Swiss-Prot record:
This is Fibrinogen beta chain. The gene is FGB. The keyword Disulfide bond applies. Residues 1-21 are annotated as: Disordered. GO terms for cellular component: extracellular region. Residues 1-10 have a biased composition (Acidic residues). It is found in: Secreted. The modification Sulfotyrosine is found at Y6. Heterohexamer; disulfide linked. Contains 2 sets of 3 non-identical chains (alpha, beta and gamma). The 2 heterotrimers are in head to head conformation with the N-termini in a small central domain. A long coiled coil structure formed by 3 polypeptide chains connects the central nodule to the C-terminal domains (distal nodules). The long C-terminal ends of the alpha chains fold back, contributing a fourth strand to the coiled coil structure. It comes from Bubalus bubalis. Keywords: Adaptive immunity, Blood coagulation, Coiled coil, Disulfide bond, Glycoprotein, Hemostasis, Immunity, Innate immunity, Pyrrolidone carboxylic acid, Secreted, Sulfation. Conversion of fibrinogen to fibrin is triggered by thrombin, which cleaves fibrinopeptides A and B from alpha and beta chains, and thus exposes the N-terminal polymerization sites responsible for the formation of the soft clot. The keyword Acetylation does not apply. Glycans are attached at T4.
């Protein structure tokens, strides 16, 4: 589980645990 900041700018990508908000 990475920090949401990582997926914050990548909301376009599928949230496979990459900081799913």
């Amino acid at each position: 589980q990475f920090p949401t900041d990582y997926d914050e700018g990548q909301d376009d990508r599928p949230k496979l645990g990459l900081g799913a908000r």
